[in-house]
Amino acid sequence: MNYGIVFGGASWEHEISIVSAIAIKKALKADLQFIFVDANREFYLINPSDMRANFFSSQKYKKCKKLYLRHGGFVTHGIFGVKEIGVDCYINLIHGCDGEDGKIAGMFEFYSLKFIGPRLEASVMSYSKVLTKLLALKCGVKTLEYEVINRDQKPNLPLPYILKPSHLGSSIGVSVVSNEKELDYALDVGFEFDGEILVEPFIDGVREFNLAGFRVGQNLELSIIEEPKKGKMLDFEQKYMSFASSSSNEADISKE
């Protein structure tokens, strides 16, 4: 089977998506086509030999063939006409907006393309921390007290608390506020990325776990549960630099 790896996107997490695509090139032993989405949402067909970070940061990708989407998949335009690139199934590796918020899922569904990744409804729900909170409460999942603030509003929860842009991942824009002096700067940082901020009590020393899963027919396949090392909070650097450079260990969780 020929897989199309779609990565990049107009997102704050653009570079992480590139790193993910490079990683899947090493890990997935299959026929792969690499489809890069730049900040202007233009599509490019990338040669596997060019899959390295500086190829994209140097803008060399602009010399690659541009791709165009139609029913049936991506095609190239040339002097000999239109040519399909021949992909059986697409894998969505775009991080953040475009990839995780449902845009790419909706595009795949609209053009009747087979793809691996969350569907439109699941993407929309999970990309919003506020909607995820509401869903968790509806399903009876224990969750922290919270409030949602917009610009020109300030939290009412007692200190310390943690501020999280509602529609963003990778801990970007997240701040822990321990006293009133730290609040204005933390709000400026959060609202730089989103117009809506989720506020929760900050609990020092809380354990965090990673668990991946996917559905095969009626069954769910789950990975081992990993526990990343962190400092006060699991920030961007620890998620993608420190954690990526060390081997991950299965979390030690009691049955209780």
What does each of the following model-derived ranges do?
Residues 1-116:
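ATP-binding N-terminal substructure of ATP-dependent carboxylate-amine bond-forming enzymes
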Residues 2-22, 32-33, 80, 123-207, ...:
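Active-site nucleotide/adenylate-binding loops and adjacent lid/helix of ATP-dependent enzymes
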Residues 43, 120, 174-177, 233-236:
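Short clusters of hydrophobic/aromatic residues that line enzyme substrate/ligand-binding pockets
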Residues 90-93, 116-118, 145, 198-200:
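Short catalytic-loop micro-motif centered on adjacent basic/acidic residues
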Residues 95-96, 171, 229-234:
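Glycine-rich phosphate/pyrophosphate-binding beta-alpha loops
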Residues 119-124, 227-230:
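Short, acidic/turn-prone active-site loops that include or flank metal/cofactor-
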Residues 179-256:
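Phosphate-binding site of ATP-dependent enzymes
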